[in-house]
């Protein structure tokens, strides 16, 4: 998967018209050059209708899928039939998939949970215990709810797995790159040294600035203490 921070330059290499294609995206974050979510970018720049864009969300770490451990996916698309077809194609004995029509909200959620996972990692690296982290994650889901409601108002249950579930697994899992990155920062690593040692991309690093700018550029800002702290 190409990280969102590098999507713009990679997509510019395309030589074929993708207007009539069905796009299934597992990329999490904002494309910096346009300030758009990945689905919005495909819609606005490549004129692909939202009915032909699907977003994959968790809670689902690839490492556990590779081990064939019971995992859960959310496929979000404006077209429920396409969403169900993708869900059926990805389902197996150990992968369960459900569908959602909240493509924008889910995209924001998968972006934000990476930021909150960095915060959880920083707290762990600083030696804060489970008591503190439980409060941190409780506050994170409330902050996520405020942010998503501000950016895309519609009826949604933020406690569903695509939002709360994905936040929890990313915030607590040993497989979470963003938590690992935050943990290293909390232990005193610089951003550059942490990135070099991990040799993997922590999407939350890029998402933090994007989320902050989205809120700052909004006519009615919302209170985002965790994002601002990260």
Locate predicted features.
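Rossmann-like NAD(P)(H) cofactor-binding subdomain of soluble oxidoreductases
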Residues: 1-68, 86
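Electropositive phosphate-/nucleotide-binding environments in soluble metabolic enzymes
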Residues: 1-4, 8, 17, 32, ...
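Generic structural signal for well-ordered alpha-helical scaffold segments
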Residues: 12-15, 43, 145, 149, ...
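A short linear boundary/processing microfeature
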Residues: 16-17, 92, 187
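Short beta-strands and strand-loop turn motifs
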Residues: 22-27, 100, 224-227
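Glycine-rich beta-alpha junction loops
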Residues: 28-30, 57-61, 79, 101-106, ...
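Internal alpha-helical scaffold of NAD(P)-dependent oxidoreductase catalytic cores
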Residues: 41-53, 70-157
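NAD(P)-dependent Rossmann-like dehydrogenase/reductase catalytic/cofactor-binding core
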Residues: 113, 120-124, 128, 149-230
């Amino acid at each position: 998967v190409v990280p969102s921070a590098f999507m713009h330059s990679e997509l510019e290499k395309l030589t074929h018209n993708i207007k009539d294609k069905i796009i299934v995206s597992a990329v999490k974050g904002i494309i910096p050059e346009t300030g758009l979510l990945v689905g919005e970018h495909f819609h606005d720049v490549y004129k692909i209708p939202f009915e032909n864009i699907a977003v994959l969300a968790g809670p689902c770490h690839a490492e556990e899928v590779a081990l064939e451990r019971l995992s859960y996916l959310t496929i979000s698309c404006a077209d429920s039939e396409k969403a169900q077809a993708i869900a059926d194609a990805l389902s197996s004995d150990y992968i369960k998939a459900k569908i959602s029509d909240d493509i924008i909200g889910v995209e924001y959620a998968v972006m934000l949970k990476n930021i909150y996972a960095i915060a959880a990692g920083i707290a762990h690296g600083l030696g804060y215990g489970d008591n503190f982290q439980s409060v941190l994650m409780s506050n994170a889901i409330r902050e996520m709810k405020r942010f998503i409601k501000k950016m895309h108002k519609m009826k949604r249950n933020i406690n569903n797995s695509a939002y709360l579930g994905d936040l929890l697994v990313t915030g607590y899992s040993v497989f979470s790159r963003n938590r690992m990155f935050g943990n290293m920062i909390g232990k005193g690593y610089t951003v550059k040294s942490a990135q070099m040692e991990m040799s993997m991309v922590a999407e939350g690093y890029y998402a933090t600035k994007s989320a902050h700018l989205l809120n700052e550029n909004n006519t009615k800002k919302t209170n985002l203490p965790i994002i601002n702290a990260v």
